[in-house]
């Protein structure tokens, strides 16, 4: 979507979603367990943009060992292609990733946002996943982020990070459903791009009035 240049205001916040080592392409120091292609390319832009925001929230996937979303927790199942039925719906299975207190769960050291006000950990309950920064995948259990933002009168939210078609997208959709104005910075996110996942999230954005823009628009 093409927008006029937006002026940042005191009630804006930048949400940087899951810029963790396991989601980034492999480096000599670490092999990303669930690497999103091109994820490392957005790091410099995120750092530059974050410096323009007074309020920045970082999110961090924080899974226990044997998490329900791990294919390895379901004998005979394979990541990316297999799913399992759960009380909260169909769960896509992934490689084990962002396991609590492991290097892969760490925020990438190239992410330089010293003024970030909050690091929100999600997905830490073994039997339910949490793509969204606002609600777990049952769309009922809150993470507390909405209350945190409302207490600070932060009403317009800009989203970047990983991955566009999952954690970034679900966060923006839930934020919009909770009454926030939500905008996704398409040039500062990358997609996992499972079959149909990008077109599906774009359709959901349009229905929810989540706007898509680039850094040049702000």
Positions of PLM-derived features:
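Active-site acidic carboxylates
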Residues: 1-123, 151, 155, 177-181, ...
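Glycine-rich nucleotide phosphate-binding loop and flanking beta-alpha elements
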Residues: 64, 126, 165-166
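Short, well-ordered secondary-structure micro-motifs
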Residues: 69, 130-133, 170, 195-196
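Short, surface-exposed loop/turn motifs that are enriched in glycine and acidic residues
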Residues: 96-101, 134-138, 161
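Histidine/lysine/aspartate-rich catalytic loop segments that bind and position anionic ligands
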Residues: 113-152
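Glycine-rich anion-binding loop/nest that anchors nucleotide
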Residues: 154-170, 184-189
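Short Gly/Thr/Asp-enriched flexible loops that form oxyanion-binding sites at enzyme active sites
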Residues: 168-178
């Amino acid at each position: 979507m093409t927008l006029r240049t937006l002026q940042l205001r005191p009630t804006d916040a930048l949400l940087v979603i899951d810029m963790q080592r396991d989601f980034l392409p492999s480096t000599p120091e670490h092999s990303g367990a669930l690497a999103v292609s091109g994820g490392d390319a957005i790091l410099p832009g995120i750092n530059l943009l974050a410096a323009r925001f007074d309020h920045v929230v970082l999110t961090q996937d924080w899974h226990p060992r044997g998490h329900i979303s791990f294919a390895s927790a379901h004998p005979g199942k394979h990541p990316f292609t297999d799913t399992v039925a759960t009380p909260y719906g169909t769960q896509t299975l992934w490689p084990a990733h962002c396991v609590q207190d492991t290097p892969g769960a760490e925020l990438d050291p190239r992410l330089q946002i010293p003024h970030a006000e909050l690091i929100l950990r999600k997905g830490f309950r073994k039997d339910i996943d949490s793509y969204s920064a606002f609600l777990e995948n049952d769309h009922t259990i809150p993470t507390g982020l909405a209350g945190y933002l409302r207490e600070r009168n932060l009403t317009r939210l800009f989203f970047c990070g990983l991955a566009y078609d999952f954690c970034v997208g679900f966060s923006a959709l839930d934020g919009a459903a909770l009454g926030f104005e939500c905008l996704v910075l398409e040039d500062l996110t990358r997609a996992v791009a499972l079959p149909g996942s990008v077109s599906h999230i774009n359709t959901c954005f349009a229905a929810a009035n989540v706007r898509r823009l680039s850094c040049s628009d702000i």
